[in-house]
């Protein structure tokens, strides 16, 4: 069973993502900011990280930059953005994100992104 770390400061987004991912037979853990996510990545391996950009404490971008400095098997990273964050996509891909998805996302789009990064 693959596992996904859902990183978002919105409890509602985490809940929606969890629901979709579990329906795709993926085990889910949640982090509420980049720092929390980094700690969890140091403690357990994840196949994929679904990553929000704007979060308190540590942003998605800072998480991406620090992920490469910790000594773990690197998860695939799908960066989540809103239409307002379109300009962030290039920066996220440059910083090592594998794919991106626009919010609000649905099951079909998330499934196709997970296929594109080879998780399912
Ligand atoms: Mg956010």
Residues covered by each model-derived region:
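Alpha4 helix (beta4-alpha4-beta5 surface) of REC/receiver domains from two-component response regulators
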Residues: 62, 84-99
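Receiver (REC) domain active-site loop signature in two-component systems and cognate sites
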Residues: 55
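Charged docking surfaces used in two-component/phosphorelay signaling
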Residues: 15-23
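Short hydrophobic/Thr-rich beta-strand motif most characteristic of the beta2 strand and flanking loop
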Residues: 25-32, 40
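C-terminal output helix
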Residues: 87, 105-114
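Acidic catalytic/metal-coordinating carboxylates
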Residues: 33-36, 59-65
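Active-site beta3 strand of CheY-like receiver
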Residues: 45-50
């Amino acid at each position: 069973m693959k596992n996904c770390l859902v990183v978002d400061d919105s409890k509602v987004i985490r809940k929606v993502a969890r629901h979709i991912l579990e329906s795709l037979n993926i085990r889910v853990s949640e982090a509420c900011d980049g720092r929390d996510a980094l700690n969890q990545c140091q403690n357990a391996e994840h196949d994929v990280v679904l990553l929000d950009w704007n979060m308190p404490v540590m942003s998605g971008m800072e998480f991406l930059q620090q992920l490469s400095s910790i000594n773990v098997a690197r998860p695939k990273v799908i960066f989540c953005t809103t239409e307002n964050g379109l300009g962030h996509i290039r920066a996220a891909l440059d910083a090592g994100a594998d794919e991106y998805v626009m919010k609000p996302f649905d099951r079909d789009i998330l499934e196709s992104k997970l296929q594109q990064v080879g998780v399912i």
